[in-house]
Amino acid sequence: MRCPKCQSLKSSVIDSRQAEDGNTIRRRRSCDQCGQRFTTYERIEEKTLVVVKKDGTREQFSREKIFNGIIRSAQKRPVSTDDIDEVVNRIEQKVRAQGDSEIESDVIGNLVMEELVELDEITYVRFASVYRSFKDVGELENLLKQMISKGSKVKPGKKDETK
């Protein structure tokens, strides 16, 4: 593993443990040349997954793109990056469990919305307003009315513990 400080390819593993998600190994390393300590993560190489967008174009699945979209929606909300990472892990697991090499972007968007409504309703509304491309305030108002009629199940920033 290349040292981020001196670029040496020689390093020693100091500590190795399984990450919380169970699919990743976290390794603490020390560069044999300069002594710099750094962390690496090892995960199973998944088969390539292609997302089919609304306009028919295709691009490689990116968990970072989902993570960044949720981060933007959760700005100034009591939602931790660990919570968001857990959401992205669950979404990726559901997408890969389908076993297909291609998935529609709408399916991913709906999975994100299912997760966000349980995590934080404001984050959900922010994400939905961009994802669904609301054309006016009336469409947003309809979404809010639907949420109110279903009853608020969660408190902001908390997961629903009743499930």
Swiss-Prot record:
Residue intervals of the ATP-cone domain: 49-139
Location of region: Disordered: 1-22
Any Pfam family: ATP-cone
Cofactor note: Binds 1 zinc ion.
Residues spanning the membrane: none
Required cofactor(s): Zn(2+)
InterPro entries: ATP-cone_dom (IPR005144), NrdR-like_N (IPR055173), RNR_NrdR-like (IPR003796)
Molecular functions per Gene Ontology: ATP binding; DNA binding; zinc ion binding
Coiled-coil regions listed in the entry: none
Domain of life: Bacteria
Similarity remark: Belongs to the NrdR family.
Role noted for this protein: Negatively regulates transcription of bacterial ribonucleotide reductase nrd genes and operons by binding to NrdR-boxes.
Protein name: Transcriptional repressor NrdR
Organism, as annotated: Streptococcus suis (strain 05ZYH33)
Primary gene name: nrdR
